[in-house]
Amino acid sequence: MQQRIERIPVADGELAVASLGDGRPMLFVSGMMGPYMSPIPANASAAMLFSFFVAVILTPWLMMKLGRKEAVRGHAHAAADGGRLGRIYAMVARPVLRSRARAWAFLLVVGMATIASLGLLYTKHVTVKLLPFDNKTNLQVIVDLPKGSSVEDTDRTLQQMVERLGDMPEIVSFQTYAGTASPFDFNGLVRHYYLRAEPQQGDIVVNLLPKGSRGRASHAIALDIRKRLEGLALPQGTVAKVVEPPPGPPVLGTLLAEIYGPDAETRRAVAGKVREAFKSVPFIVDVDDSYHNQPQRMRVAIDQDNLDYYRVEQSDVYDTLRYLYGGTTVGYSHRGGGRQPIPIRIALPKGEKVIDERALTTPVPANALPAGLGVVELGDVVSVSEQPASYPVFRHNGRAAEMVMAELAGAYEAPIYGMLAVNDAISKADWGNVPKPVIALHGQPDDETRPILLWDGEWEVTWVTFRDMGAAFMVAILGIYILVVAQFGSFKLPLVILTPIPLTFIGIMLGHWLFAAPFTATSMIGFIALAGIIVRNSILLVDFIRHSGGQGRPMVDVLLEAGSVRFKPILLTALAAMIGAGVILTDPIFQGLAIALLFGLVSSTLLTVLVIPAIYVALK
């Protein structure tokens, strides 16, 4: 017993170092998710170091000061068999450890259960999403009318939408912006909403009741808003998008396809077919593109013959057009001591700055009239024609690309499912003379001689986050393996310690399925945290077995004693973590973390104390 007591600080040190190494992966997440992830391992590592010193220094001192009488009495009998929990454990574990065949059968069943739990991802009973929707207090409705619409048309459309949504009880107020940008946040910065200042562009800011004063989350309200606006009669070609503030890094579009190709015409043709594929998927909504319909422009050309006939100077025509549509400053008001003179300007109202018959009657100075001085109408010396204007040009990292973007709502709300559905629609579509694009998942293409569809948006953030976390997690596991090899002097024993890590998926996937919650980045964080807890539990068992197996006793008795004695502290540790995780179970962002910890701890705690001894029996 004294030898075991002396081993406590050493074992605790191993556990602390293993847990510290397990939390490092989140420090190596690149991209926009990096700043969101990096504080977690830093704070967790500091807390782990602090708790280690408390456990090996402060707790024994407090026991000596406050628990002296209990320590004198002792609980030798309880420690020997683990008490009531230990006896229950022995009753359950004894049949499993009775023979190698039973141990192998148990391990096979556990392995099949782990694979079956991961099968929930394949069957889509558990979906994958980087970050769930948060419960915010405001939403946005972004509206784009056809090019050439006036500010009045835009404002009229916004008011129709407000009237349609006005009876929703969760909405406190609306703020409408026609022809100008609303105050933008981080999401608006990334999506360039601050540049929305054209007459056909509008924005509605929907302010909601506080979270505690309404029964629905903001995401459910957004779905309701989108459904109500579907039946509204809008001008043909109008695009309306319901935008929710993202809980994590904002992107240009949740589902974003970038089309690369040899020339602009090919890119737009391919993008048009891709947009049709987007619209064919029921759960893809708010479909839009970066180029829209080809805009028209009014071209004012000077009639040189009439210019010579009326002896009108070109500069006079240009000055007239500039004054007509840009206004002019005729003087300054020097009130207030002249420190800040106020310009006196003559300019048309914004709504009247159009090229029509009235504008063409504007006088222009002429010298060919009787008496040598006079004026002619602007329409006498210019001709006006409507011509197609150039498409807007979008570039990503300096390379021209057309973009098709959309949101997801309904059966699936993660980009991976929209991507799979669109890829399937693209493969089944009749492309005719339009070249079919090659699908790329990551990285801009090197060869643009043929059309290429690159998936971006939330998928890019998801790919980078899970790739970096997964790779760093593998490195962390390798580091833990090396640490345990150095401690125990064995290459096989660390494999036994690390084997139960996948067992957490049994509880994690079942928990997400029961709560109908997606497997998110916070769920992945929970899995990483659980891996550290599993390693701690495994080291506790293996360390006890190693120091109890050299006394000539049967292996099964040693394994049962190790499980009986260690089961109670392992269970108490799990319960403490589960109580802490239960607090965030209702949080929309960290629900995945809470589910992973709660249900993963249940499955891993109950199975680890059986799997480790079963591996010893199976491989003895």
Model-inferred region functions:
Residues M1-R24:
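Alpha/beta-hydrolase fold catalytic core
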Residues G31-Y36, A71, V110-K147, L189-R191, ...:
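Transmembrane helices with small-residue packing motifs
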Residues P35-H77, I204, L503, N537, ...:
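Transmembrane alpha-helices and their membrane-interface boundaries in multi-pass membrane transporters
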Residues A76-K129, A257, F466:
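Signature of alpha-helical transmembrane segments and their immediate interfacial
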Residues Q140-I142, I204-R226, L256-Y260, I342-R345, ...:
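A short beta-strand structural signal in non-transmembrane regions
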Residues D153-P250, E276, D305-G327, H334:
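Solvent-exposed, membrane-proximal periplasmic/extracellular interface segments of envelope transport
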Residues R268, R275-A476, V485-F488, V556-V558:
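Extracytoplasmic/periplasmic membrane-proximal domains and adjacent transmembrane bundles
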